[in-house]
């Protein structure tokens, strides 16, 4: 049997982290079993589904590198197929037309509620004689009246639901459109889905869908219903806990590897291991190892993972993701060092790519003013002599290398008989405009000789003016 999984989001909003984790689990199960992963867009809610949401879902999946083997399929393009099956079911007697008005159904529910009974359709039209063609009606699935639906969930174990608890589900509306639960069944059947990984909020749908599959003579997939993700306060994860959209994490400077690594651990583990490559996840992941307890989202842990990946991944790869943030912050990288070199220089300090981009601006753009606090502290009168001497030594360099720059700074401190800080701190403020940067040798090397000399000259004039004022 070829394992075939699917991710089937509804395009009524962005791809949120809960959906991304479900997609990841489904993708991993397919890859771990040399199977296939299908992307399906469940857009039957015509009022709420939007193309913007479809685009956001596809963008999120692509950014996460969760590639699909089939799709994306769209349910709205398969209405003829769904109606074909419904018509076959009407002929076979596994579905029937229901002519009950909304008013009658509401009255039935009120009466059931008053008696403390479970509110469900009372079967009024089940077995009723056909009425005139064209009379408004819905089509209901003829749910079995006795027995139970039993299935073994990979996460929750054996689940059993008595059929008497289930309704005769509407599978086609009055306007002729098929309903969500029915479309899902036909899609899973037609697409050969063997394993359905989805959120626990779908558990109530599963016995209904299994009964329809049985009525169609279709194979029953295996199911894994994963628990919801909670905020750190124990409440359901929402916008008040911070970002919930996958692409918001991109915008905030996270790498896809960090988010994937974090999401997979929200409900799954492999020993005490915290950090996984995608190859390791494919090797180790098993549906049966998913924990059924809800997991709390910890933003600090995600930030820690992101910092790890910024440092650990190939600088060329990180630079490709950093480029988006440079453009987003309006930084023109065409006149300056290679982004990969900047990543190498700044990765030890940066927790996010957004932060890294902001802190790298001085490599590409000249600044109008020095940071006021840093200038007050380090560009004082005593800095004039060290700045002038290091300026001369740097100007004399024939090779603009890290080693040569370091030697020039060291020689300046030695000749003036001062500590390296007396040279280094004014020089750092001079060339960066602020008080933080990587080592001065690599900072100057990346800024370049001409730009460095220009900035040091500006700092010398600044200190001189300060002395004379």
From Swiss-Prot:
Cellular location(s): Cytoplasm
Alphabetized SUPFAM superfamilies for the sequence: An anticodon-binding domain of class I aminoacyl-tRNA synthetases, Nucleotidylyl transferase
Binding locations of ATP: 239
Biological role: Catalyzes the attachment of glutamate to tRNA(Glu) in a two-step reaction: glutamate is first activated by ATP to form Glu-AMP and then transferred to the acceptor end of tRNA(Glu).
GO MF: ATP binding; glutamate-tRNA ligase activity; tRNA binding; zinc ion binding
Subunit: Monomer.
UniProt KW keywords: Aminoacyl-tRNA synthetase, ATP-binding, Cytoplasm, Ligase, Nucleotide-binding, Protein biosynthesis
Enzyme class: ligase
The name this protein goes by in its record: Glutamate--tRNA ligase
Motif ('KMSKS' region): 236-240
PANTHER family: GLUTAMATE--TRNA LIGASE, GLUTAMATE--TRNA LIGASE, MITOCHONDRIAL-RELATED
